[in-house]
Structure formats: structure tokens, C-alpha cells
Amino acid sequence: MTEVECWDDDPDFASDVDNASLFTQSIATTSASTSVDDGFSFDDSISRLNSLSISDVPSAHSRVEQWNQQVHNLNHELSSNKNRISSNVEGYEDDFSFDEEGEEGNNEFNTLRPNKYQDADVDEFNTIRASETASQRPPIPFSSDTLKKTYLSSENDARYPSVSDSPYCESEGFSSFEDDFEIDPDTDLNSILHRKQNRMDPKASFSSVEQSSLRTPSSAHNDDGFWDDFDIDFNNETESIFRKKIRSPNTINQKHPYISSTISYQPNVHQDAKYYPLCKDIFPSLANENPHSDNPNLKYSSKTLSKRDTSSHYPETLKASSKHSSPVKGNSSISSTWTPSNLKIYHSKNSMGLMDLDALKTVASNSKYRTKPKNCKTYGDGTELDTLDELPVDYEFELKLRKKQTTKVSGTPKSKHAGSTQEWHSHTTPRSTSKHENNLNNITNSAKNEHIRSQRQHKTHAAPSKELTKESLSNDQLSVKEKRRHHKKAPTLIQNLNSPRTPKIVGKMRYNPTKHCWEGNDYAIRDFDTPISPSRPALISNISTKKGIQVVGNMVYDPTRLRWIDNSISGQEAEDPFSGFDDLEDTDSTSQYLNENSGSFNGSINSIINFPDMSEIYDVGPEFEKKQFSEDIQWRKRIDGWFFSFKNDDRSRLWELYNILNAEQ
């Protein structure tokens, strides 16, 4: 946005009463917000405000005279309170630079330009927007109705002294409407003032004329070549986003490019029409034939069969590969197809259509595809027990152990039921166990049939017992079903539910399933084993003296003398400074002192040293004693908790060394 250079851009600004009053208010606000220490002259601002009196304007109204009187009173209050401002207050006028050159010319109103804005935000259009501050600036009354709404100043802020005698401080909850607006040069201040005087909402929508001032500036519409770096075609952008490309019917498979997939439309088939699988679906060896054969006899059409016949017919023909077909793929001259012409289809009204077994076997014999069972185990052909003799079995005794039929039918004679059981025994003469079981099944089936027949005959003689017979039949069926449900299964092979005996390895550990323990951590306890001493000691070798010789610069270490020797060119060996002195004799003796007063062991070692006669005596001054005493106190405080303290501690032993030294003197 363009920056506002001055307030007098409008040539009629001096004659406009509202604009003049607005500028006067802004100058008064700036004067009220400044401090003395920043170099701003209050007298200069007062004289400037007096020069801005608009009483000479020919179009002035009576409210303008009131406003001039209010401005004069405000200036008087400012001049009387300027001494109250403390010197350590940050000056508000530091953010503005006042141009004083306009006083010499005809320019009535000076230009106010911001010098710096530390706490302001600058957007991308270089518009200065004031940030929110903790203290609120004094509002400006724009009309006679808003005179009571004056600026509020905190008591703790020295920049805004409280004017207790002013009649403007009656309403304390008033806040200026200018805080709701951002400082924008394109905003029409005259329209905002007009809205405020007419008690209109300043945030209401502007008219078409007023919206022209809020339009985006022309500088934002300038083509700066920002989109030149992007290869974007705006004409084709919508097409690429919203228009979906139509895929061709013949697409290329990414994994197998040589295979072309075709999309075809398949209408919904009627529910009654059923398609049965072809023979090549049942026998995969027939899949090597040409799938695009145009022979109409080999295709199945649902139109040739009616709805009733489609559910009971297989395809009319079967295809089979010839025995002499070549195993080489693609050799169509050698391969041939065989179509049996004598296939018979047995069809009846009550049964499904069945193919001829001979034709099916012929097709199966010509097929190359053979399936082998997985994990086939041959246990025998079933003739292993034929050589063994049959065991003697008492069938009559076993029949007694069998549970007889306990179902009773109401209205039926017991003699028939008993006769049926007798017939069971008369027919039980099997030759083997397997035949005997089959005969028992036949007997039970015949007994059931006789029971049903007797019930039917009884219906003709006894009509009122129809309901009872139905109930008995239902009970018989339920009993049979319950027996089948509660029948226990034969025992199967007992499987080991435990984990298989395979060694488990976790890190460096291995589980031994036989010993049921973990192994592999034996190395952890090897350090605790006693070292095995060698069977014979090592040979003691002679250490040569040449191995210990070391040379550092001009010095050579002699391992025999255990000292360093000068190996300079001169060859002169330096004299030993301690050659005239004898070695010191060790005269130290130790004694152990036991404290008998304390019950615990408090041993102390006191060393008694036999010093030679002291030739010199040093006098210790009082300052040195004070220094040692203070250091001793500090040291005791530091190590006070390091040792155990006893109640009956005898500290007399601490004076032994002192007494010994004094006795020798």
C-alpha cells in the first residue's frame, strides 16, 4: 500500500471543519502521551494548538466553539500536570519525528511521520498495525455527545496522570472505538467520524463508494513474474483435475505386456438358466486346445434347451485330446481332437441327467493329467485276515446284551410288537461278524417298516387316534436323533500335547529336552574355579644386563647401579652432590596404645621420634595462631560426621605428642 505523506493532501483540508477537528484531536493525543525527558516542548505544542483554532472558519457551528473551549481546557490541564511526569518514563514521542520546517511556509499543518515502530506489526503490504499493549491510550471525544467519554489512565502509570477535577472522567467503562480499527492509510477518516457522530456502527458494511477505499491496492495486482518459474497451463488445469480419462478397452498388463486384456459386457443371466462346467474344466489336460474354436457343436447354448431341461443336462459333447498328440506346444498339425459320437445321456423325469460311464472312462484314459495322493501309505489290500480262522462268538448271548426298543405306541397291540422282536431272533444266523451286523441293520429297517404299516392299518380302524399316532412318530424320530447326537465317538490316537523335543536356543543358552534344563552358561562360573598349577615349574632363565639398558638423550640408565649416567661426548661424568654425606639411620619405633576407659577398641599408633638437639628456635606470632585456630575449626566442621563419637571418649591421648615435644626441650 502507498504511504500517507501528510495530512494536507486534500486542498480543502483547512476549510473542512471535521478534518480540522480530527487533526487537532490527534495532536492533542500526541501531546498528552509524551514526556518531558524526551525533549518535547509542551509550550511549543500549546502554541501550535492555539494556532489551530478554527473559530475564524466562516462555516463554523456552535459546537465548534464548544470544542475550542474544551481544547483550551485540556491544554491548561496538560500544562499544569506536566511536572507530575517522572523522568524515567519512556517517551511516547520517540516513535515520531516532527517536521519543524513547515512553520516558515504557508503550510498550516505539519506532517507526522513514524520514525520507528518497535512494537508494531508490518504486513506484506507495508501497512503499520499497532500491537496490543497493556496500557490503554486516552480516547478522543469527537462530538458533544461523547464529551463525557474521556480517556482512562491507570494510577500506576506516570505517563497518564489522572485528572480528577475534569468533568470527562464520569464514565469509567468507556473505551475508544479507534481501538477496534487498524491504522490503515486507505481508510476514510471522515466517514468514520461521520458514523460515530450519527451513532452508527463503525464495523457495519460500507457502501459501494466507501468500499472503493478498501479495495486491494493496484500494487498488489502488478505482474511481477512470480508465476514464470512454474510450468503451469491454467487452460488445461481444470481438465486434468475434473475430467477423467476414458480407458481404452484393450489395456496392457504391466506384469505381462504380451497379454492383452479385453473388457466385455456380460448381461445378467436368468436365475433359472444354469451353466454346467465343461469337460476341460474337469480335466485340465484338455485346456491345451485352441480356446477360440469356431465349431458350434462344441459350445453350449442356453437357447437350445428350455428352462426345465437346463437344470438336468450336461454339455452335449465332450472334447478329449488324442493319444498321439505331440507334447510340443504350438504344433497344431500333429495334435488332434476326438469327439465321441455315441455318448448316451440317460434322462428321466424324476432323476438328473447322467453321462455314460464307458464314455467317461475312455476320456479319462486318454487324459495325460494324473494325480498322485500325497503321503500315501499302503497298509494292505484287505486280504491279510483271510488266512486266519474266525473266533467263536455266542451271538445269542450278545443279543441279550443289546438294548431293545423301548418306544411304546398308544393304541397298538403288544402282540405285534412282540412278534416283531421274535422275528428278529429268527433271522439272526450270520456266518461272520460283518454279515451279522448287516443283517441286524436289515432287521431294524424291516421292524420300522412293519411298525409304520401297523400304524397305517390302525388309522383305518381307529379314526380318533390319528393325533396319537402322529405324536408317536415324532417321538420315534426324536429318539433316533438324540441317540445319534449322544453317541460317543470311538477313541482316536493319543497325541502328545507337550512341545516337541527339539532344543530351544535363546541367545547363548540352549534348552536340553532330555535333561529338562538350560545349558550354555558354564563359562560364567569358570572364574571361580581354582587355577590348576603346572606339573613342573618353569625354568629360571638368566636375565642379561643388556636388556635393562635405556637411553634417553645423553642419559643412559645403568640397571646394575640403578641410576642414570651421562653419556655426553666429553665423557666426563658429573660429580655426585651427595658423595660427602652418609646415609641416614632408621631410628623410628612404633608403639600401640589401648584406651582402657572406653569399652570398645580405640587403638592408636603413636610414633616416638628421637630428634637431635634443636639449634634454632622459631617464635610463632599470635596472628599465625589465630589463623591455625580458624582453619582447625573449619576442618572439624567438615569431618565432624565422618567418625563415630563415644560418650566416654578419653581425649587425653591427644596430648601425648605435645608433652613429648615439650619434655625434650
Curated annotation (Swiss-Prot):
Q: Please provide, in alphabetical order, the Gene Ontology terms of the cellular component aspect for this entry.
A: Bfa1-Bub2 complex; cytoplasm; cytosol; mitotic spindle pole body; old mitotic spindle pole body; protein-containing complex
Region of interest (Disordered), residue spans: 96-120, 196-220, 288-336, 404-506
* GO terms (BP aspect): cell division; negative regulation of exit from mitosis; negative regulation of mitotic cytokinesis; negative regulation of septation initiation signaling
For bias type Acidic residues, the affected ranges are 96-106
Cystine bridges: which residues? none
Any single GO molecular-function term of the entry would be: GTPase activator activity
Task: Tell me which domain of life the UniProt entry assigns to the organism this sequence originates from.
Answer: Eukaryota
Q: Where is the composition biased (Polar residues)?
A: 205-220, 288-304, 319-336, 407-432
**InterPro entries tied to this protein:** Bfa1/Byr4 (IPR034586)
> Which UniProt key words apply to this protein?
Cell cycle, Cell division, Cytoplasm, Mitosis, Phosphoprotein
Localization, per the record, is: Cytoplasm
Q: Which residues carry this modification: Phosphoserine?
A: S326
Family (UniProt): To yeast BFA1.
In UniProt terms, what function does this protein have? Has an essential role in ensuring cytokinesis and septation occur only once during mitosis. It does so by interacting with the ras1 signaling pathways, thereby suppressing them.
On assembly, the entry states: Interacts with hyperphosphorylated cdc11.
Q: Mind telling me what this protein is named?
A: Protein byr4
Source organism (scientific name): Schizosaccharomyces pombe (strain 972 / ATCC 24843) (Fission yeast)
